[in-house]
């Protein structure tokens, strides 16, 4: 199937938003994706979620219309789905209340990443508190921050973590550390350990010249107020609530294309967990 890449911005986005069909065209699968979300999605359409979107289109007998937004992925619902630039997002948390979600097509979780020669042992989040492991890389706005706070490592690590965004001012803007940077810091010895969502890290762990070890975290965090922070997540395809007629065909495509999707996840090196 052909992929129609469209860079959406400014007046072009507004014009597209006005063209809102009553029913989604099932021969043209409109999927929003970010140009800034590698390894999930990138401007070249080489992210593993971009590849899964192509599988869905193929299985549906549709043309993939991959609508690339030059925004961070957290804005895809607001600036893509809600503006009717697209109907589908690949790789959302199962049960995301902003969308209709399919049955999960994979499950994974947060992980520790270390150099193999560091001989790190442990699969509980509390295990970051080990002698000789003092510097931690992670993506902002993630459970990694809670883990470091609860183990007393957060404040000590602040200056190093800020250096990963070149000390960029985080006020009134969304700032993030690239997933690739989180892993290269470990490989190069800048960080002793990374705490990262495994699908974000797998490609870079796989391709690292320095042998790395990725270990899934097996327990969840219970905050001091009793709230549970899960560290394992099921991933689904999200569909706009204005186009529920797409949900069934996408569910069927996930089933008929399961072998191809599993092969993509395996090639990516993502550690998979049994469906919950």
Swiss-Prot record:
Signal peptide start-end: 1-24
Top-level taxon: Bacteria
Localization: Periplasm
Main location: periplasm
Keyword match Signal: yes
Xref: InterPro entries: Methanol_oxidation_MoxJ, Solute-binding_3/MltF_N
UniProt-recorded name of the protein: Protein MoxJ
Taxonomic source organism: Paracoccus denitrificans
Name of the coding gene: moxJ
């Amino acid at each position: 199937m052909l992929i129609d890449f469209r860079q959406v911005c400014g007046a072009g986005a507004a014009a597209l938003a006005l063209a809102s069909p009553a029913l989604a065209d099932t021969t043209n699968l409109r999927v929003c994706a970010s140009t800034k979300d590698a390894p999930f999605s990138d401007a070249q359409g080489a992210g593993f979620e971009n590849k899964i979107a192509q599988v869905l289109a193929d299985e549906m007998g549709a043309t993939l219309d991959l609508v690339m937004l030059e925004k961070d992925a957290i804005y895809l619902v607001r600036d893509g789905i809600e503006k009717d630039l697209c109907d589908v997002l690949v790789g959302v948390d199962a049960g995301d209340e902003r969308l209709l979600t399919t049955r999960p097509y994979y499950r994974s979780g947060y992980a520790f990443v270390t150099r193999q020669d560091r001989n790190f042992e442990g699969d509980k989040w509390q295990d970051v508190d080990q002698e000789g492991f003092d510097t931690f890389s992670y993506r902002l706005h993630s459970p990694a921050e809670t883990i470091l706070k609860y183990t007393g490592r957060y404040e000590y690590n602040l200056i190093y973590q800020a250096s990963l965004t070149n000390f960029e001012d985080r006020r009134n803007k969304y700032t993030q550390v690239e997933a690739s940077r989180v892993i290269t810091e470990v490989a190069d010895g800048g960080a002793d350990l990374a705490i990262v969502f495994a699908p974000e890290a797998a490609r870079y762990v796989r391709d690292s010249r320095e042998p790395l070890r990725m270990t899934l975290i097996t327990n969840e965090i219970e905050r001091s107020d009793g709230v549970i922070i899960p560290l394992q997540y099921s991933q689904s395809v999200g569909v706009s609530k204005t186009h529920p007629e797409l949900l069934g065909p996408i569910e069927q495509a996930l089933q008929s294309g399961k072998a191809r999707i599993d092969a993509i996840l395996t090639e990516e090196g993502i550690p998979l967990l049994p469906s919950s």
